[in-house]
From Swiss-Prot:
It is found in: Plastid, Chloroplast membrane. NCBIfam families: tatC. It is a multi-pass membrane protein. Belongs to the TatC family. One of its GO terms (cellular component) is chloroplast membrane. It holds the Pfam family TatC. GO terms for biological process: intracellular protein transmembrane transport; protein transport by the Tat complex. This is Uncharacterized tatC-like protein ycf43. The keyword Chloroplast applies. Keywords: Chloroplast, Membrane, Plastid, Transmembrane, Transmembrane helix. The chain crosses the membrane at residues 41-61, 64-84, 91-111, 125-145, 146-166, 172-192, 204-224, 232-252. GO terms for molecular function: proton motive force dependent protein transmembrane transporter activity. It comes from the Eukaryota. It comes from Pyropia yezoensis.
Length: 254
C-alpha cells in the first residue's frame, strides 16, 4: 500500500508559491551592521574618488555648466571665489556620480532578505528613482535653464550690461538641477503610496484641483529664478509627472 502524507506543505505543486527569500541565510545583528559599515565605506570612498576626478576636470565641467548662459561674462568678486566655487561644483558632481553606486550598494544589502514579491516592487523603484533624478537634471539643463537665462538676460539688456558673479550663477544652476531632479521623483512617491494602500489612483484623480494649486506653488519654490516662463514650465512638468504616476497606478490596478 502506497501512503502519501496529506500534510506536506512543500509539494512539487505548491513549492513555487511559497514566498521566501532566495538567500535565506541567517545573519546576526553584528554581521548585518558589519556589512552595512563596509558598504557605507565603499560609497564614501567612491564619493571621494568621484569628487577628486571632478575637481581635476573642473574646467570642462564649468564650461558645460556655463554653456546655457550665452553671451554672459562672469566675474570673480572676491579672492578665492572661483576656487571655493570649484570645490562646491566638484562635490555636487561627486554626489551625482555616487548616487547610482549608492543605490547599487543598497540593492546588494537588502537583496538577500527580500521575498520574490518584494523584489518585483522595491528593485524597480530604486532603479527608476535614479533614472528619474538623472532625467530631471537633463530636463533642467536643456529646457529650464535656457528658458530662465534667456528671460533674465533679455530683460533690461538695453539698460544694463549683464556681468554675473561666478559663485552666484553656479549656485543658481546647481540648485535648479537638484530641485528639478527631486521633483521628478513624484511618480516614485505615488507608487509607494499606491502600493502600500495609503492612497489609490482614484483618490489621486479626485484631488486634481488641489494638485494644480500645489504644482503652481512648487513651480515657484523649486525654480531659483523668479521669471514666469521657468515657473510655468516647472509647474507643467510637475503636473505631467503626477498624472503619469496615476497612469502607472491604473495599469497596476492600484
Amino acid at each position: 500500500m502506497n501512503l502519501k502524507p496529506q500534510n506536506n506543505l512543500l509539494t512539487n505543486e505548491n513549492i513555487d508559491h511559497v514566498d521566501i527569500p532566495e538567500n535565506d541565510i541567517p545573519m546576526s545583528i553584528t554581521e548585518h551592521l558589519e556589512e552595512l559599515r563596509q558598504r557605507t565605506l565603499f560609497v564614501f570612498l567612491f564619493f571621494l574618488f568621484a569628487t577628486t576626478i571632478s575637481f581635476t576636470q573642473i574646467k570642462i565641467i564649468v564650461a558645460i555648466l556655463q554653456a546655457p548662459a550665452v553671451g554672459i561674462k562672469f566675474l570673480q568678486l572676491a579672492p578665492g571665489e572661483y576656487f571655493f566655487s570649484s570645490i562646491k561644483v566638484a562635490i555636487y558632481c561627486g554626489i551625482v556620480a555616487t548616487t547610482p553606486f549608492a543605490v547599487y550598494q543598497v540593492i546588494l544589502y537588502i537583496l538577500p532578505g527580500l521575498t520574490g514579491k518584494e523584489r518585483k516592487i522595491i528593485l524597480p523603484l530604486l532603479i527608476s528613482s535614479v533614472l528619474l533624478f538623472i532625467t530631471g537634471g537633463i530636463f533642467a539643463y536643456f529646457v529650464l535653464a535656457p528658458a530662465a537665462l534667456t528671460f533674465l538676460i533679455s530683460y533690461g539688456s538695453d539698460i544694463v550690461e549683464p556681468l554675473w558673479s561666478f559663485e552666484q550663477y553656479f549656485d543658481f544652476i546647481l540648485l535648479l538641477l537638484l530641485s528639478t531632479g527631486l521633483a521628478f521623483e513624484i511618480p516614485i512617491i505615488q507608487l509607494l503610496l499606491g502600493v502600500s494602500g495609503t492612497f489609490s489612483s482614484s483618490q489621486m484623480i479626485r484631488a486634481w484641483r488641489y494638485i494644480i494649486i500645489i504644482a503652481t506653488i512648487a513651480g515657484a519654490i523649486l525654480t531659483p529664478s523668479t521669471d514666469p516662463v521657468t515657473q510655468l514650465i516647472m509647474s507643467s512638468a510637475v503636473l505631467l509627472l503626477y498624472f503619469g504616476g496615476i497612469v502607472i497606478l491604473l495599469v497596476l490596478k492600484k
